[in-house]
Curated annotation (Swiss-Prot):
Native source species: Corynebacterium glutamicum (strain ATCC 13032 / DSM 20300 / JCM 1318 / BCRC 11384 / CCUG 27702 / LMG 3730 / NBRC 12168 / NCIMB 10025 / NRRL B-2784 / 534)
Gene field: miaA
Ligand binding (ATP): 9-16
Pfam families recorded: IPPT (PF01715)
The organism's place on the tree of life at top rank: Bacteria
Protein name per UniProt: tRNA dimethylallyltransferase
Positions of region (Interaction with substrate tRNA): 34-37
Cofactor(s) for this UniProt protein: Mg(2+)
Protein role: Catalyzes the transfer of a dimethylallyl group onto the adenine at position 37 in tRNAs that read codons beginning with uridine, leading to the formation of N6-(dimethylallyl)adenosine (i(6)A).
Family membership: Belongs to the IPP transferase family.
Length: 301
């Protein structure tokens, strides 16, 4: 039976390159698990591989949503599970590539999403309107520090959702997620790219500089014409949020660059913390030869 391989780890650690290399070795197809690469036209700012960079490897779950759509882990899970099972039915190896934490977990674990209640949600949305997202996120931190650690303090939708789940279930938001010591769906093997700040931070700065050199601002301007606004899932993405603020005169372009770098570093710390808690991950050194290390772990070297 074909076993899927998941490639996880922090932003700028080389997941896409490792995914392509493994797909070549294992006759695989890539399933994207980066929530922002699901958006059409969000290419430069998400380091989405170009068609040429995909080297003939089929990719799934790229360019699925319009920038006006609200992201949905449940919708992604349904669509991506279907993709993985289709790839397996054709005798090919699904290579799941991405660092979006809840999206990875929704795919490799059989995550049944907790209930919703429009009245409870409306109450938290009213409180959001009253006190603002950062204050509401601080309340979440008091109730459930683990949930607050993986939800950005400027993400109103997921902050409200976490509070809704806590109230409806009487448990921490994290308790609604499957345990990370359960067998992964399909027996998926999880390969993680281990990095140090000393190695990764310069890569983040170089990647951010390259984004701006390659036309990131023009990309955002084009997406604004497609309906991108700051108060949306896509508009709150790291980099896009800062460029939109600079376009609106709310910060300088220098600040936009610096805050993209620091925002990415903050996100990387959360990714490290999240994936380090998953003992099913087999780690490879991102600064070495991760492909050779991964193949050895998989018993293919």
């Amino acid at each position: 039976m074909v076993t899927p391989i998941a490639v996880v780890g922090p932003t700028a650690s080389g997941k896409s390159a490792l995914g392509i290399a493994l797909a070549h070795k294992l006759d695989g197809e890539v399933v994207n698990v980066d929530s922002m690469q699901l958006y059409k036209g969000m290419d430069i700012g998400t380091a989405k591989l170009t068609v040429e960079e995909r080297e003939g490897i089929a990719h799934h779950q790229l360019d699925v949503w319009d920038v006006t759509e609200t992201a949905s882990v449940a919708r992604f899970q349904s669509d991506a599970v279907a993709d993985v099972e289709d790839i397996m039915s054709r005798g090919k190896t699904p290579i799941l590539v991405g660092g979006s934490m809840l999206y990875v977990q929704s795919l490799v674990d059989d995550w049944q999403f907790p209930p919703t209640d429009s009245a409870v949600r409306a109450r938290f949305e009213a409180r959001l309107a009253d006190i603002g997202v950062e204050a509401l996120h601080a309340e979440l931190t008091q109730l459930d520090p683990e949930a607050a650690a993986v939800i950005e303090s400027n993400d109103p939708r997921r902050t409200v959702r976490a509070l809704e789940v806590i109230e409806l279930t009487g448990q921490p938001f994290q308790a609604s997620q499957p345990p990370k010591d359960a067998p992964p769906r399909w027996g998926t093997r999880i390969i993680g790219l281990k990095t140090t700040p000393e190695w990764l931070n310069p890569r983040i700065e170089q990647r951010t500089a390259r984004m701006f050199e390659q036309g990131f601002v023009a990309e955002v301007e084009h997406l604004v014409q497609q309906g991108l606004i700051a108060d949306s899932t896509a508009g709150r993405a790291i980099g896009y949020s800062q460029v939109l603020a600079a376009m609106a005169g709310e910060m300088t372009w220098e600040d936009a660059f610096e805050r993209t770098v620091t925002g990415t570093r903050r996100y990387v710390r959360r990714q490290r913390s999240w994936f380090n808690r998953d003992h099913r991950v087999s780690w490879v050194d991102a600064s070495g030869d991760p492909t050779a290390q991964a193949l050895e772990i998989l018993g293919l070297q």
